[in-house]
Amino acid sequence: MAARLLLRSLRVLSARSATLPPPSARCSHSGAEARLETPSAKKLTDIGIRRIFSSEHDIFRESVRKFFQEEVIPYHEEWEKAGEVSRELWEKAGKQGLLGINIAEKHGGIGGDLLSTAVTWEEQAYSNCTGPGFSLHSDIVMPYIANYGTKEQIEQFIPQMTAGKCIGAIAMTEPGAGSDLQGVRTNAKRSGSDWILNGSKVFITNGWLSDLVIVVAVTNREARSPAHGISLFLVENGMKGFIKGKKLHKMGMKAQDTAELFFEDVRLPASALLGEENKGFYYLMQELPQERLLIADLAISACEFMFEETRNYVRQRKAFGKTVAHIQTVQHKLAELKTNICVTRAFVDSCLQLHETKRLDSASASMAKYWASELQNTVAYQCVQLHGGWGYMWEYPIAKAYVDARVQPIYGGTNEIMKELIARQIVSDS
């Protein structure tokens, strides 16, 4: 019953958004109940703040927060040791309506709006539990199928992915090709009407548990540029020649399964091609801004979590006969952190609004990802410092947040690549 009510509220929200004025108008205080922005909120993680959200989003946020408190946080330490979350969690998330939120209902998704999706990103960050790969599955993998897949592909995979019964991954990165997607060596060659796939991928999130992987492969080495010869393929777990390597032992995100994948003469039917042949690079460029916005929102939400965790600590910890929070240097550091967090939150929220109306460009998404992920690492460093020796202990949440933050400037395109993309727009004549 709870899940059905949740789905209904999301559908109502989606229907309302079609008749509402544009986001810029909805953000004005005139004629609407004023909502606090993060600088004025009692806590940066409070429910009911930020003008981009509505009361329906607040109701949804409460249910998502409860889900993470009851179904994720109590088991996360166990999953960190296992190097993966349970498949049961995925199906629970599906029943709760937390997967495929922004995928159209006609395709088998929930049919909610982008801001509802953002709620799930933020609440996972507030839980300090990086294990569940829900956002990659729902908001990176599923859109490729929904946007470029055939009717048969959509009907076969989207409903199962929304239910958490089919876990998705995307395989771009290779041992010799990370941010340089044009350096991909994994290839697919025609064999009659089929394709023969060979190659390897590394650092694949959800790779170990995955039931379906979108694989980036070269299909035309004679193309005028590598970008013109890349295609996407849907590879299912269990296909002959598809081998999952070991789970990789990472510095952080220890409960998030990350694997190597190998493809040895995997025979794929023609129906495994996703979209048009040799158009894969363009599909990737089209979808990457959402991935970078996702990383930015996760990053600033993690900053908000770390700030509140640290504020609570320094208000309780005593030194020199008073709480650490009453030491002026600590107060100044907290003031700096909160100011930077609130400024970045305002920018990320503006990017969420732009993306909700399909107006977020690559450079803006790159700015958000670059700035927010750098700030996340700065905040993590300073918050550990404010915890003193206890911040170095794994039992303290800030220690885990510190190591989890380090990958944010690396994946989704390194921050050095983000600067290249931003600079390209600056100097472009068009």
UniProtKB/Swiss-Prot annotation:
**Which Pfam families has this protein been placed in?**
Acyl-CoA_dh_1 (PF00441), Acyl-CoA_dh_M (PF02770), Acyl-CoA_dh_N (PF02771)
Give the protein's recorded name. Answer: Long-chain specific acyl-CoA dehydrogenase, mitochondrial
Q: Give the protein family.
A: Belongs to the acyl-CoA dehydrogenase family.
How does the record describe its quaternary structure?
Homotetramer.
Q: Which organism is it from?
A: Rattus norvegicus (Rat)
Quote the gene name from the UniProt entry: Acadl
Which pathway does it take part in?
Lipid metabolism; mitochondrial fatty acid beta-oxidation
Q: The organism sits in which domain of life?
A: Eukaryota
Q: Which keywords does the record carry? A: Acetylation, FAD, Fatty acid metabolism, Flavoprotein, Lipid metabolism, Mitochondrion, Oxidoreductase, Phosphoprotein, Transit peptide
- GO BP, sorted A to Z: carnitine catabolic process; carnitine metabolic process, CoA-linked; fatty acid beta-oxidation using acyl-CoA dehydrogenase; fatty acid catabolic process; lipid catabolic process; long-chain fatty acid catabolic process; negative regulation of fatty acid biosynthetic process; negative regulation of fatty acid oxidation
Q: Where is the transit peptide?
A: 1-30
